[in-house]
Amino acid sequence: MKLQWWQGPCQPLDHVARTKAESRQQQLTKPAGSLGRLEKLAIHLAALQGRERPSLDKLWIAIFAGDHGVVAEGVSAYPQAVTGQMLANFVSGGAAISVLARELDAALEVIDLGTAEPLPPLPGVRHLYVGAGTQNLAREPAMTLSQLLICLEAGRDSLLRARAVGCDLFVGGEMGIGNTTAAAALACWLLGCPASELAGPGTGLDGAGVAHKARVIDAALALHHAQIDGPLQALVHLGGFEIAALTGAYLAAAQQGIAVLVDGFICSVAALLAVRLNPGCRDWLLFAHHGAEPGHVRVLQALGAEPLLELGLRLGEGSGAALAVPLLRLACSLHGQMATFAEAAVAQRPQ
């Protein structure tokens, strides 16, 4: 059987660079281990970048957007029109991720994979019309296999554009009213959990709304169970265009040797799908935060992930990942710019 592109090998970590970075950490003017996880982050980034002193100068943020047919089941507190409206807000500079991208001097790419309401061409938005959003996963498969493949490739293509300009850290974000329902459904399938354990408020549902959302997800899982035989079919039946694109981007990043900072619940579900499709990509994924959606912690546990922040976030857009970028940059700066004991003429601890 012919291998698909996402099954190709991921780049190996550079163990020589890791060893050099570990040695450097032992020589810096501080007690060994006193910077905690910042030391481990710098060492891991050294292994990813293949250099003793890593840096994160070029940040690429890609926002993938798409609508969800399951909104017809009353699973969101916001109307579906918001997806398209937010695309305009992203490129006009008014969204949270727009502000964060400016502050971080990051490239921001916005990709429209298909909104329910047709949009005029928006300057600064890449319009890739895969469909008028997904179908209602509570009633039928969310998308066709052809649509899934297009979305996976859309994620890969964004990553390749990032690589072409020398990106050294990729952040994926998402926008799509109803996408926490799709993400929770996928997480339930991936983890074998009932929806009552993973469904959350999304954009702001109350307790009754969350309970209804869980019932919709459980019904969808029962409807599609017999047809799902792996991650790709899970995406076809339960996924979203933007979730598939994120999955493709994460896989391509590992194949191209670019570190990824994963955002919240939806992005973490895409990361788990990517790891299930190609386990070698796991080393290239860093996890920004533990968000407020109840399913997020379960997905992070399945990935063996240690998130950097816990701020009660549930916005999406890549915002939590963007907030964690300064922490990674400071870890690199401390590692690369602190003096060694020899350089500073500081006495070391006696052996």
Swiss-Prot record:
GO terms for molecular function: nicotinate-nucleotide-dimethylbenzimidazole phosphoribosyltransferase activity. GO terms for biological process: cobalamin biosynthetic process. It catalyses: 5,6-dimethylbenzimidazole + nicotinate beta-D-ribonucleotide = alpha-ribazole 5'-phosphate + nicotinate + H(+). The active site is at 317 (proton acceptor). Pathway: Nucleoside biosynthesis; alpha-ribazole biosynthesis; alpha-ribazole from 5,6-dimethylbenzimidazole: step 1/2. It comes from the Bacteria. Its EC number is 2.4.2.21. Keywords: Cobalamin biosynthesis, Glycosyltransferase, Transferase. Catalyzes the synthesis of alpha-ribazole-5'-phosphate from nicotinate mononucleotide (NAMN) and 5,6-dimethylbenzimidazole (DMB). Belongs to the CobT family. This is Nicotinate-nucleotide--dimethylbenzimidazole phosphoribosyltransferase. It comes from Ectopseudomonas mendocina (strain ymp).
